[in-house]
Amino acid sequence: MDLQKFTQQVQQTIADAQNLAIASEHQEIDVIHVFKVLLTESDFAKRAYDVAEVNVEALQKVVDESLRKIPVVSGSGVNYGQAMSQALFQLMRDAEKEQKQLDDDFVSTEHLILAVMDQKSNPITVELKKQNKSKKQINEAILKIRGGKKVTSQNAEENYEALTKYGRDLVAEVRSGKLDPVIGRDAEIRNVIRILSRKTKNNPVLIGEPGVGKTAIVEGLAQRIVRKDVPEGLKDKTIISLDIGSLIAGAKYRGEFEERLKAVLQEVKQSDGQILLFIDEIHTIVGAGKTDGAMDAGNMLKPMLARGELHCIGATTLDEYRQYIEKDAALERRFQKVLVPEPTVEDTVSILRGLKERFEIHHGVNIHDNALVAAASLSNRYITDRFLPDKAIDLVDEACATIRVEIDSMPSELDEVTRKVMQLEIEEAALKEEKDPASERRLEMLQRELADYKEEANKMKSKWESEKSEISKIREVREQIDHLRHELEEAENNYDLNKAAELRHGKIPAVEKELLALETENREKTAQEDRILQEEVTENEIAEIVGRWTGIPVTKLVEGEREKLLKLADVLHQKVIGQDDAVQLVSDAVLRARAGIKDPKRPIGSFIFLGPTGVGKTELAKALAYNMFDSEDHMIRIDMSEYMEKHSVSRLVGAPPGYVGYEEGGQLTEAVRRNPYSIVLLDEIEKAHPDVFNILLQVLDDGRITDSQGRLIDFKNTVIIMTSNIGSNLLLERTEEGEISPELESDVMQILQSEFKPEFLNRVDDIILFKPLTLADIKGIVEKLVEELQIRLADQEITITISDNAKAFIAEEAYDPVYGARPLKRYIVRHVETPLAREIVSGKIMPHSSVEIDLQDKEFTFKVTE
């Protein structure tokens, strides 16, 4: 018996049968062991018996029973599973005879299945006879599966019914109602039909960005085939979507993948043009299976495509088409391109309206039309790195899922009451142990309170459950309508006019009437009373999801946020002292953006802050970030002194291809891509190389920039602040009592214009001059710094108060108009914080104490009170 004459699956079956015999402590490998393995592991054996209409479960029971009857030999030195039984030898010899009869090159699984029928006393044959199955019937089933193929390779079993194994029948899926409806895209579908109807080169390839609906076009074609809304040549055709993953998966040996693909192509060829093969992500076929000098899968397609034996529809993205298919001119020539553009916002709304019902049925919610319009427009405006309609469909789906989760989980109000009941029950159990009068009185009060809470919890629970059941009932009726409509479509396609008339004029209107009554009743109840559950998906839910994905607040302004925005200028005035004009201009820009009246094609605001060092330019940017986002993390700070050389400019948008760091992206572009709603602070811009400003031109004008990877980065939701010290010497010398004269402003602007190009300055919203700080401003800053120190000491519960004399002394001593507020910080650290720290460490100032800081003979004194 030559094992090389067996297919790999038969060889594996014998090896597994031996392992089974060893595990079961059987001395010999028998036919029963082989069939136990075949019935559990071989897809072909199960399929053959299924086609022959054998009761496989009954057969498996017989095999298991027979296995249990084989005697178990135990003891030391026993060799398990080392010999083949006489019956198994006979089976192998009979299988070889079957192989010769069928004119095959190798012994495969089907020969074993046929050979066992010659062993009349074998339990398997006895069971099959009991089920009235003859060898002839099983042989017919095998020939049906083989479809005229011979066993010419050691992987033969892998290649039977290849299309069923490695593909999905889209037309069958449409008939069973598994696919969503395809709305629009009529021009592209017509184009595909036109190409498919050609005599030669009748292979369209759909090219478009990811998410624009390439696969949906093929699904739309399948739906048209089912509706018979196609030319005569395409009627009754089948579209098989090839699953590349399952085609490649498990192909262990060289050539196995090609063999599977060849089997698929052979089946398509034998169908005489009845099967249209759809290969999604067709670029994966080009080069698949290619090893040194080996022929790849793409080359296997070429001859069949050229001869018109293969009707193929491909789909791939623009980048991958260029990268893989355009390089292979011979393959590209055999395909006809169909460009699939991104749909407009209006088209996307139509697509969403068509899918609305499917989402409502799946999630059991009610979607408002304004939610669909919001999904299309907001996704187009804020989610710039993806394409319509995919991103809009995802938004609607996630908003529906959010509402569904809220319906299914316990409402927060009920959850609170339930927790309160649990807390009181624990307290009650503890008080029952106490016997003193005070505890008994407390117990009595607690029991009354507990009874009230329990009653409230029960009321809320019953209300929640009744609302939930109402929503479920509406969902069930919607599902029923969907099922009836699908039946109607099927009846019309099959020309079953009686059934179609009964459904159209009888069943469907009756169920629709029931749904209308339920929805009306539900709406009336909602209007009359406060509902615990919300089942409506509105534009607010969509805006919330956009905010969650991008970090950009697009929801309608709530009361708390209105207050915060209106008071933004006042809050910034407290943080940045003495720069009223700058604060007002920045807060106005944020206000315009949040009210939705800013130019949607430009950043929220772009400013140049000019002024001497230490007057609050960077501090204002930090304060704005803190007030807009409650943290300074949303501020992207880039020190322009790092971009002084020409070659360092590329670091902003990423290194060019071929250079180190190309994959990492740019420091500015990556930061904004991850955080599209943020403040971009470009510190000390006069230190940067002039080429940096060329990059910033389109950012300031169009709110967008292309990084080194070719991605479009959106700056439309950023505040761009640039700081500079240009003209600070003039501001220091000629500012009178904190006011900047028009002449001084004009002189500073002239210096600025000599430093920067006019096209750069012209694109900035505002150039703001920061005034040098006066002594009065410095006193205000002392207050602020003392407050910050107080916050740092709050952890140790130490409170400090500082006398007016001490504050005035600090302001006078530390005031230097040239250096602004920074010397003030240094002075407080040296003369207040350091002595204070020494007192705390020495134990003179303990936690929970108050410290009064005063001035005596130009020295600071610390008076501690408990």
Curated annotation (Swiss-Prot):
Residues 3-148 form the Clp R domain. Residues 84-148 are annotated as: Repeat 2. CDD domains: AAA, RecA-like_ClpB_Hsp104-like. Residues 161-342 are annotated as: NBD1. One of its GO terms (cellular component) is cytoplasm. Part of a stress-induced multi-chaperone system, it is involved in the recovery of the cell from heat-induced damage, in cooperation with DnaK, DnaJ and GrpE. Acts before DnaK, in the processing of protein aggregates. Protein binding stimulates the ATPase activity; ATP hydrolysis unfolds the denatured protein aggregates, which probably helps expose new hydrophobic binding sites on the surface of ClpB-bound aggregates, contributing to the solubilization and refolding of denatured protein aggregates by DnaK. This is Chaperone protein ClpB. The gene is clpB. Residues 773-866 are annotated as: C-terminal. Residues 393-527 form a coiled coil. One of its GO terms (biological process) is cellular response to heat. Belongs to the ClpA/ClpB family. ATP 2 binds at G611, P612, T613, G614, V615, G616, K617, T618. It holds the Pfam family AAA_2. Disulfide bonds: none annotated. Homohexamer. The oligomerization is ATP-dependent. Residues 561-772 are annotated as: NBD2. It comes from Listeria innocua serovar 6a (strain ATCC BAA-680 / CLIP 11262). One of its GO terms (molecular function) is ATP binding. ATP 1 binds at G208, E209, P210, G211, V212, G213, K214, T215. PANTHER family: ATP-DEPENDENT CLP PROTEASE, HEAT SHOCK PROTEIN 104. The Clp repeat (R) domain probably functions as a substrate-discriminating domain, recruiting aggregated proteins to the ClpB hexamer and/or stabilizing bound proteins. The NBD2 domain is responsible for oligomerization, whereas the NBD1 domain stabilizes the hexamer probably in an ATP-dependent manner. The movement of the coiled-coil domain is essential for ClpB ability to rescue proteins from an aggregated state, probably by pulling apart large aggregated proteins, which are bound between the coiled-coils motifs of adjacent ClpB subunits in the functional hexamer. PROSITE patterns: CLP_R, CLPAB_1, CLPAB_2. Keywords: ATP-binding, Chaperone, Coiled coil, Cytoplasm, Nucleotide-binding, Repeat, Stress response. It is found in: Cytoplasm. Residues 6-70 are annotated as: Repeat 1. Residues 343-551 are annotated as: Linker. It comes from the Bacteria.
